[in-house]
């Protein structure tokens, strides 16, 4: 027989780093080209005028201007636009 109890193990003790997702530039804000507007998983927000999409679905400005958000279409898609300044 063992003279000591088993050491046991834990199934906890780890946590994932925060992913820093969300809206980074709000409606009406003046931003520069290349600025990140939204970091997201999937396309909760869709690109509109003067907005590009990164490979991780990040939306960013293609021109300097003001950010605006809109809800369009029968499916109520949230779109992000940048109006050139």
Curated annotation (Swiss-Prot):
Residues 1-20 are annotated as: Disordered. PROSITE patterns: RIBOSOMAL_L27. Keywords: Ribonucleoprotein, Ribosomal protein. SUPFAM superfamilies: Ribosomal L27 protein-like. The keyword Ribosomal protein applies. InterPro entries: Ribosomal_bL27 (IPR001684), Ribosomal_bL27_CS (IPR018261). Gene3D superfamilies: 2.40.50.100. Signal peptide: none annotated. GO terms for molecular function: structural constituent of ribosome. One of its GO terms (biological process) is translation. It comes from the Bacteria. Residues 1-10 have a biased composition (Gly residues). GO terms for cellular component: cytosolic large ribosomal subunit. Pfam families: Ribosomal_L27. Belongs to the bacterial ribosomal protein bL27 family. This is Large ribosomal subunit protein bL27. It comes from Delftia acidovorans (strain DSM 14801 / SPH-1). The lineage of its organism: Bacteria, Pseudomonadati, Pseudomonadota, Betaproteobacteria, Burkholderiales. The gene is rpmA.
